[in-house]
Structures are given as C-alpha cells and as structure tokens.
Amino acid sequence: MLKMDLQFFASKKGVGSTKNGRDSHSKRLGAKRADGQAVTGGSILVRQRGTRVYPGENVGKGGDDTLFAKIDGVVKYERVGRDRKKVSVYPA
C-alpha cells in the first residue's frame, strides 16, 4: 500500500502587530481672544507651549504658560522688538 505524506500550509499568514495606530487628542492651543476684544478678569487670552507670546500690562502667566487677563478691559496685541509679541489688557 502507498503511504502519502500530506502537509497542509496556512492559507493566511499570521499578521504581526504594528507600532502605529494611535494618536493624541489635540490640545486646542492658540489665541482665545482677539485684538480689541473686551475681556473680564481671569479670562484666558492665549494657550501655548513655551512663551511664544509674552505677558504685558495686566496679564498673568500660568504654570503651563497660559496667558490670562488680570483685570476687566480690552485686549491689545503688541510687537516688542523684531521677533517678540506681547499681549496686554488695558482698562476700557
């Protein structure tokens, strides 16, 4: 009698895992109040990483570099020197 040696191979190859496939949530950074806009004290003016915009008159800087109004007033963005910006709040 004939003896046959049958071997079956996988019809689908095993698929390895990928190192991609995830993404972080956006941090919603940027200016939150426009130039000339009226704000109340405590309003967030700019959310940023590092000091892209510097605090000016009546503006505070939080621990995560967020700029906020210290008083009620009107927002004013100003240029300081060639490559620096600051934001101030002046009483209305």
Swiss-Prot record:
The N-terminus is cleaved by ribosomal processing cysteine protease Prp. InterPro entries: Ribosomal_bL27, Ribosomal_bL27_CS. Keywords: Ribonucleoprotein, Ribosomal protein. It comes from the Bacteria. PROSITE patterns: RIBOSOMAL_L27. Residues 13-34 are annotated as: Disordered. Residues 1-9 form a propeptide. GO terms for biological process: translation. One of its GO terms (cellular component) is cytosolic large ribosomal subunit. GO terms for molecular function: structural constituent of ribosome. Signal peptide: none annotated. It holds the Pfam family Ribosomal_L27. PANTHER family: LARGE RIBOSOMAL SUBUNIT PROTEIN BL27M (PTHR15893:SF0), RIBOSOMAL PROTEIN L27 (PTHR15893). This is Large ribosomal subunit protein bL27. The gene is rpmA.
